[in-house]
Amino acid sequence: MSEQLLDGVPLTALSGVGAAIAEKLGRIGIHNVQDLLFHLPMRYEDRTRVTPIADVRPESFATIEGFVQLAEVQFGRRPILSVTLSDGTSKIMLKFFNFNAGMKNSFVVGARVKAFGEVKRGRFMAEIHHPEYQVLRNNQPLTLAETLTPIYSTTEGLKQASLRKMTEQALAVLNNVKVAELLPDQYNPHQYSLKEALLLLHRPPPSISAEVLEKGEHPAQKRLIFEELLAHNLAMQQLRVGAKQQQAQALHYQTDLKARFLASLPFAPTGAQQRVVADIERDLAQASPMMRLVQGDVGSGKTLVAALAALLAIDNGKQVALMAPTEILAEQHANNFANWLRPFGIEVGWLAGKVKGKARTAQLEAIKNGEVQMIIGTHALFQESVVFHDLALVIIDEQHRFGVHQRLTLREKGAKADIYPHQLIMTATPIPRTLAMTVYADLDTSIIDELPPGRTPITTVVVSEDRRGEVVQRVYQACKNEQRQAYWVCTLIDESEVLEAQAAAAIAEDLQRALPDLRIGLVHGRMKPQEKQAIMAEFKAANLDLLVATTVIEVGVDVPNASLMIIENSERLGLAQLHQLRGRVGRGATASHCVLMYKPPLGKISSKRLQVMRDSQDGFYIAEKDLEIRGTGEILGTKQTGMAEFKVADLMRDRKMIPLVQRYAKQIIVENPPLAEALIKRWLGDRAEYTNA
């Protein structure tokens, strides 16, 4: 057996993986064979047996076999190929919305067909839309899968079949190389070796319930989850210990700048804002770096808190960097801060991908020589060409969009002669207390738990897709009769950006036909940042009535005149994302409304989630409910909630493991530092460098 370790086996060692495929795999965090094996299936399909048609159930997947009784093309808005199969127990209809003449001609009456797909309730009988199918010769033996079929999350240009072939080869490699078994028995409560767990989870025998696997409840999954949580906890503990030993500039107000700034505002800070600012000022007065997380619900006024933190550093002659996750949000911050700070002679600069040529060179020079005191940008702020004059405070907005590694890179950039900048992280994704201790174990936490006066409550209604016509009329009424603006959000989850962009464009066209008098704009993830910003600027300037968007508008867009939001397929989104999207309205003095449209029938979990949205606008309550609902079984990936980047763990689902993980992490840090390093390296890869920051 080879002594080579899995993370040393390149992807190109697998047949069929060249540079182009390796680049696509890299997009989803897969850089070597170990990464590929840690990319576990998000769900499984049981294709190991044929289900009699009489026994199929809506909203479940099934393999069926039957004979064609009828195949016809129905003509409407677009042609649909409908094929009726019978197996003697009952009938089922296969529907194809995209088909060609060859497909149609293969479904001759009497032909034997095997099909697999999700069963839906139809008008006359059960239906499967776009099934995978095979037309069989009458004497051809039926072949079925021997294990559950894994379904992996993927990216544009990577098909499920290709990923399965690659993992098949990776499993063969797994059998031939040594796998470092990092968890000694006393730290492995689940009694599976790493190799056993990986072999089982990529190709589970049909005796294991797909439902148990999808809930993350199988001991083989728990074995991997436990090790990953342990690695993250060890990394956070190392980080916190390291940070406390570093030096920072202690900051105290030198002038009356704060009082003059507050006097210039048309409103007074809320009690919660004042309390959080006091926490920050206390941290900034210390000679070790502040590492504070400020959680504020949507619209709670985090920007003002950030401005007051920045003022203290600037009053000491220092620079402040504020990093936002998108160019739209960075530009919005740049405008807000310029309006607030320039009257006091404070120069505000901004740096994003679209700042190019001479303007970029001039901005970089102004940052380097200290002419600009407040620098705002996207991740462009930590490119090597950016050199700060005297950076004392780093503010990161919407922490969940940045990995820990990124914010530490920015902190390293500010380090001079072993003096490190203070860090303030702001998030509008409220984190249940149970989880905050794990995700942000290296940070102190403050909460802004009060909304500024003048914010109007948002009325939320839940309506079926069947009432789409009424919803379109409501949009017309809001935009034309009430002179308001509206958002129409389209969602496609686990689909490619290309499909999402096409769907959004099609919806925008449909709405433009239905509402010819309205000025309609479109933004989606496939557009260049400049295009997105141009459309957003038009919307903000009220030159557009309706903005059709994908979930790219989730964070920080501020248009007070927008008072109506429609979210299509709302049942597909998690609570955190729904809450963020809804927070784009309710920012002015007019009563705002949010319409959550869903495709019936609505599952039990989706129904609970939409009810929580209808009943509450409190982000912390919604986060706790999210925890409860997910604990009942429907698991959405961690990435969607923006909690942290995990390969196999989901903090919501796996929170019961956390106390034991924390206990073991404390023991390992003290008793076995080399084991801590090995675990961190395996699960965090090059991101592990941040533990030495």
Task: Put a short name on every predicted segment.
Residues 1-14, 23-26, 231-232, 242:
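Long, highly charged, low-complexity intrinsically disordered interaction regions
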Residues 275-278, 289-611, 667, 671-675:
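Inter-lobe coupling/hinge segments of SF2-like helicase ATPases
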Residues 74-265, 638:
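Upstream accessory/linker segments immediately N-terminal to the RecA-like ATPase cores of bacterial MutS
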Residues 42-62:
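Short boundary/loop segments of OB/S1/cold-shock single-stranded nucleic-acid-binding domains
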Residues 58-79, 117:
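Structural detector for short beta-strands of small beta-barrel domains
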Residues 67, 118-119, 570, 584:
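Short, surface-exposed secondary-structure boundary micro-motifs
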Residues 589, 601-693:
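C-terminal accessory region of SF2 helicases/translocases
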